[in-house]
Amino acid sequence: MSRIRIVALVLLAACYGRDNPPRPHTAPTPAPTPIAAAPIDTADTKAKLIAKHGDAHRARIEQGVDQVAKLWRPEDGDRTAFGAFCDEQFLADPNARDALFERMQTMLEQINGHNLEVGRATRWHTEVDTGPMQPIDALLAGYDPSAHVVDDLFASKVAFAALLNFPLTTLEARLRDGTSWDRRAWAEARLTGWFDTRVPSNLAQAATAAEVAADQYIAGYNIWMHHVLGEDGKRRFPSGKRLISHWNLRDELKANYADDEGLHKQRTIARIMERIVTQTIPRGVIDNPHLDWDPFANKVTAGQEVEADAPKRTTTLDDAREPDTRFQHVRAHFLAAREIDKFSPIAPTRIARAFDAAEMPEQRVRALLVELLESPLAADAAKEMTQRLGRKPEPHDIWYEFGVPTVESELDAITRVRYPTADAFAKDIPRILKDLGFTPERAQYLSDRILVDPSRGAGHAMGAERRGDKAHLRTRVEAGGMDYKGYNIAVHELGHNIEQTFSLNEIDHTLLSGVPNTAFTEALAFLFQARDRALLGLPSQSAEVERLRVLDAYWNTREIAGSALVELDVWSWLYANPNATAAELREATVRIAREVWNKYYEPTLGGHDTVLLGIYSHTITSPLYLFNYVLGHLIAFQVEEHVAGKDTATFATEFERVCRLGAILPDLWMQQATGKPVTAEPMLRATEAALRSGR
């Protein structure tokens, strides 16, 4: 499906609010994109239209007719019907064409927005913690009201009217010519982007079903840590601590650098992660506090202490491993994508569609990943880390935090008192926004358009897509209140919601709502997340804290770069081995994760053949998304550098301004936001300076 539909759930803000009238449409029309040979003879139709409207419209007529013909099917009508449609719907008058554009834009906002609301309702009980789920909830969540939209718009010929009158563009053309387009030209490109492929609704529904099943699988992938034993058999985690993979496991590991028993805990968590990736984890211990588990010996014993609120689970002692369920979900995504590939001539693989949605070529993204991974700064950063740790680095130190260590329990105490419920966080949003620099009026305007829901999963942001609807912030609140991990995620998701709200309600063309790609949504959310401790009233950062923040940004970005590279290589392997079983996919994933680790991480962290790079749950729920996080960190760093040293009011003003640049090319967006294209150089330069000043 189109780029617009791919990124629909994460569309954020765009430029020109209601106080800023749109500029005249003065930029050159996007250059015609070569179209494959039409399945029917178009010569007669073109000749008649040129004779009717004049040679001045020849280029538009030829391109529009070819665009329609390429996706016209026998059920749409015969040659006569095709010609009649083109004769009736081609618009030579600029005013009529403008009216069509506005009709289409308004229609798509309403269709997209209402379908999102229906989908949000059908998935409500699987995504929001409303109590025990009912059997029907999973079935309702599998319903996708938008699955038939594009199919129906083709069947009704609405899609063909857009393709006949507005240019369809390829990524290559947008990269080549897009810098000269004005916003109307970009909006036209986004309009036809809805219809660049014609995927049958049953295939779209199958892809959605795979996504829902994977989401539910991961949402239930919790480890009850009080029932996980260390290598010495000791129970080190408190009763009731339930961690979802991978987010909470990773964050718990990061939080234990200041703990007296932290190293033992970290080694235990790392072993859990390895068991998950290799699928040697006993299936009986997943989300089960009735069994104790030693992940080192991989032995299951009867639970000695069971929490009062423990869910009903098996008490049967069984060491049988999880039967490659993790990779069955990846394979299901792949099989659904393969069917869609046949109907995606512009981007004929899931990989190609991911980069088409990002509007950055795969080769360029891979080059950025490798640039980070091969930088010699890693050795210097690891050397400082080793000195701070006072021990030899271990593989789990890939998640080391250079920042000033804080015992997580101290932060938990603050957040649990302040946010006993999701509603308490919602009521505090105006204060949070004012502390970030937004005016009281702006803070209230934004908070009035955001609802907070208790999440079953780790948390996420769901923006509205129709003016009049509201964005939803999903955050996980355990019994006893929101812990720091949940708060940290909630602040991140709030950043998404603020972007989404600006986008939807203040935009010249709703077709340009959002940002160039999902990496930018993550980048702007990271700007909020980086200020989470300040929002709790903790001391402002010193020069040393700022230096360590830079090292953190580099170390974290480099960590995700490896995981992203593993995922890209896994999907390339899948396309080269389309008949692979889940077991074969597991073996390939483990092999690739080890190869990337051994090449880029073993020199600084040791751990030959470590598989930790395969732990990210995104690879199960949202395939080919991880590279966006790397881009997001780079973009966030560039934007943060742009607002560095400015007061909070300036931060808020600049945050809104860059959010409102719209869904244009990534480099064009970044150039207008910071004066530089997307690059790793600012981060690497700052990292080098931070390392030098710390010596």
Give residue spans per PLM region:
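C-terminal motif of bacterial Sec signal peptides marking the signal peptidase cleavage site
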Residues: L12-A14
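C-terminal, non-catalytic "cap/extension" segments appended to globular domains
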Residues: P32-E305, H333-T406, P578-R695
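Active-site recognition of the HExxH zinc-binding catalytic motif
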Residues: L473-L504, A525-F526
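Auxiliary, metal-adjacent structural segments of Zn-dependent hydrolase domains
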Residues: P405-D469
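Bacterial signal peptide processing site
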Residues: Y16-R18
